[in-house]
Amino acid sequence: MEDLFDKDITILNKYVDKEHRTKYKVSYIKGFWSSNNGISINGTQLIKNDELIAKILINDTRNEKYQKIEDFRKNQKTWTLQNGDYLIKGIVNDFKTIANLREQYDEIMKITNISIKDYGAKELQHFTITGAWYEIYGWI
C-alpha cells in the first residue's frame, strides 16, 4: 500500500507563539498527491474544475506520528492537519514566508477540508485532504 503513498509532501502548520506572533512549523511526510487542472461544460457554460487532493496513511511508519489539533496548539511536536494550513508537493528546505514559497513551488495547496477515514483495515486508514490551488495568477 505504501507504494501508492510515495510522494514527498511538506506540511506548513500555522500556530501562534508565546509572543502572539504567527509562525509556521515545517514537517515532511510521505503521501499520495493528485492534481487536476480542468474545465467542465454545463450547457452553455464553461466552469473551471481544478482539484487538489492529498491522502496520508494514518499508520504509515515512515511519517512522524500525527498530533491532534488541540495538542498541537499547546506544543508543536510533530504535525497536524487544519484548515488554512499548507501542503506543498516536494520537500521545502528553505521556507521563509508564504509569499516566497509561492514564487518557488508549483503545487501548493491551502487546506480547505480534512476527512478522517479511520475504518476498515488498519493499512487502508487515511486522511483525505482537499484544498485550493495556487497558480501564478493567484488562488483559484
Spell out what each predicted region is:
Residues 1-22, 26-29:
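N-terminal intrinsically disordered, low-complexity, charge/repeat-rich segments that act as generic
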Residues 23-140:
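Short, conserved turn/kink motifs that form compact alpha/beta structural patches or helix kinks used as
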